[in-house]
């Protein structure tokens, strides 16, 4: 049985307060088990480690223009490559760099794959501008992020909520019907405004991602890329480096997202993102000689 929550329950799901009734007492048993208590302790230690890493990086601020430029270029290429590769884009890392940095057309690769790389890069530019202006995520900015990803690929659906029902291939849950998407998005933004200051920034960013792509899936296409972008938007606003989900982590990534959607258990996904966030400081240490 697939559980579709009402709007009141939806808001509680995002804060991790509702158990999936189709799974009886399964979530409660996990929460009260010694293993779960150990996992929560591990999460707290991860967050403390991330805060220490951020403080260490903040001590070097302001970073030199050369360091900032190199970090931005490296992040743009790696983030675009991995995020698109997760969705099936076959451009390699070096080909992605050639497209973005040099404007080169890669033989044997489709026009769509080139446009996906360029669109994702433009979306990163937009996120950086939002952060500079200290803007929060809104329905308008969310739709513009999606528009930048798809406007040269599927203009009719870019930046527009889906008008059709969809399935997520291989997932154990079904996104809401198209007619419910606008009200579900209203509930999402209500939760977003209320929850942001009640969680560690990395946990909040991970939950924004999981809730958006799993419970909502509001667009016909491009939901995964949009989710990874808005997750990183929240990390950037909080002063953390960009978290890149590597394509070789895709099986765990999808499995943890599905656990969050079907069991209401966000911990595995939050842990995965927190561990990747630890690794995201490495390019800074390399350039700073630490």
How should each PLM-predicted stretch be described?
Residues 3-290:
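FIC/Doc superfamily catalytic core
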């Amino acid at each position: 049985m697939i559980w579709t929550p009402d709007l009141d329950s939806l808001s509680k799901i995002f804060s991790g307060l509702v158990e999936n009734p189709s799974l009886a007492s399964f979530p409660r048993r996990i929460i009260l088990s010694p293993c779960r208590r150990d996992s929560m302790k591990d999460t707290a230690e991860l967050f403390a480690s991330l805060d220490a890493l951020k403080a260490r990086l903040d001590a070097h601020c302001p970073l030199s223009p050369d360091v900032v430029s190199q970090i931005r270029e490296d992040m743009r290429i790696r983030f675009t490559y991995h995020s698109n590769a997760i969705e099936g884009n076959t451009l390699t890392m070096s080909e992605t760099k050639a497209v973005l940095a040099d404007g080169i057309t890669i033989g044997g690769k489709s026009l769509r794959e080139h446009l996906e790389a360029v669109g994702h890069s433009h979306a990163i530019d937009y996120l950086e501008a939002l952060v500079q202006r200290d803007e929060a995520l809104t329905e308008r900015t969310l739709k513009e992020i999606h528009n930048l990803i798809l406007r040269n690929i599927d203009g009719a659906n870019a930046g527009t909520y889906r008008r059709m029902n969809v399935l997520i291939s291989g997932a154990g849950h079904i996104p809401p019907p198209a007619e419910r998407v606008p009200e579900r998005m209203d509930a999402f933004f209500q939760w977003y405004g209320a929850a942001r200051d009640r969680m560690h920034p990395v946990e909040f960013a991970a939950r924004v991602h999981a809730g958006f792509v799993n419970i909502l899936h509001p667009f016909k296409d491009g939901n995964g890329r949009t989710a990874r972008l808005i997750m990183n938007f929240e990390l950037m606003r909080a002063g953390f480096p960009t978290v890149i989900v590597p394509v070789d982590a895709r099986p765990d990534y999808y499995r943890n997202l599905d656990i969050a959607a079907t069991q209401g258990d966000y911990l595995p996904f939050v842990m995965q993102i927190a561990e990747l966030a630890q690794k995201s400081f490495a390019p800074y240490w390399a350039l700073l000689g630490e």
